[in-house]
C-alpha cells in the first residue's frame, strides 16, 4: 500500500474549471504521464517543485492555489476565478 503524501491539492477542481481538462491533457502540457497526474491528484505522489510550478502555470494561478501543506489552507474552489 502506498503511503499518502502530506501535500494536498486542488488539481481535479482546477481541471474541471478549465473546460474539463482531462488528466491526459494536463500530463501532456506538463510533460509527464497520465499516471503521474493521477498519483498527484490522489495525493499518492508529491511532485517536484519544478513540476508543481509547471502545473500552477498551466492553470494560470499561484502555486499555493494548487497545493497546500499541513497547516496551510487551500482557497475555496470558487476563489480561483
State each model region's role.
Residues 1, 57, 67-81:
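Short, charged recognition helix plus adjacent turn
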Residues 10-29:
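Short basic helix-loop element that most often maps to the first helix and adjoining turn
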Residues 12, 38-39, 67:
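Key DNA-contacting residues within the recognition helix of helix-turn-helix
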Residues 15, 41, 70:
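DNA major-groove recognition helix of helix-turn-helix
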Residues 31-46:
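Recognition helix of helix-turn-helix/homeodomain-like DNA-binding domains
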Residues 50-65:
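DNA major-groove recognition helix of helix-turn-helix/homeodomain DNA-binding modules
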Amino acid at each position: 500500500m502506498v503511503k499518502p503524501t502530506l501535500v494536498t491539492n486542488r488539481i481535479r477542481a482546477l481541471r474541471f474549471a478549465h473546460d474539463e481538462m482531462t488528466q491526459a491533457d494536463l500530463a501532456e502540457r506538463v510533460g509527464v504521464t497520465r499516471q503521474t497526474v493521477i498519483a498527484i491528484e490522489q495525493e499518492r505522489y508529491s511532485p517536484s517543485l519544478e513540476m508543481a510550478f509547471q502545473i500552477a502555470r498551466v492553470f494560470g494561478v499561484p502555486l499555493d492555489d494548487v497545493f497546500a501543506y499541513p497547516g496551510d489552507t487551500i482557497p475555496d474552489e470558487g476563489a480561483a476565478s
